[in-house]
A protein has these predicted regions:
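Classic N-terminal secretory signal peptides
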Residues: 1-21
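Mitochondrial intermembrane space
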Residues: 18-114
Length: 114
């Protein structure tokens, strides 16, 4: 009985913590997705090659993070929580996170217009 109580208490804490975490802009490791993009980039013998593609990808992701900082307050906590949860399952990308949040906000605004 005590173990059941402890498990229920732990679950309640985890449920309460998740929305709170969604209020902060996550620090995503974009290196894996950028390495993947760079590997698909131009042949190393071509001008720039994968090294340039990687650095441009990282720069682009940081620009998207800054866009997220500027727009963060326009998204609902549930939108943030859902979209951040999607980023934790695979290769994290601020570009994908911004896209998810913008689609969620657009859907909300369409529903409010009905």
């Amino acid at each position: 009985m005590r173990a059941l109580f402890i498990a229920a208490a732990a679950a309640a804490v985890l449920i309460a913590v998740r929305p709170a975490q969604a209020q902060a802009i996550p620090d995503l490791n974009v290196d894996p997705v950028c390495h993947g993009i760079a590997q698909q980039a131009a042949d190393p013998s071509e001008k720039g090659g994968p090294d340039l593609a990687f650095s441009k990808c990282v720069q682009s992701e940081q620009a998207m993070r800054q866009k997220l900082v500027n727009e963060w307050s326009t998204f609902l906590p549930t939108e943030k929580s859902n979209c951040i949860g999607e980023q934790m399952g695979g290769m994290a990308s601020y570009t994908d996170l911004v896209s998810c949040l913008e689609m969620a906000k657009d859907a909300r605004q369409l529903n409010q217009g009905k």
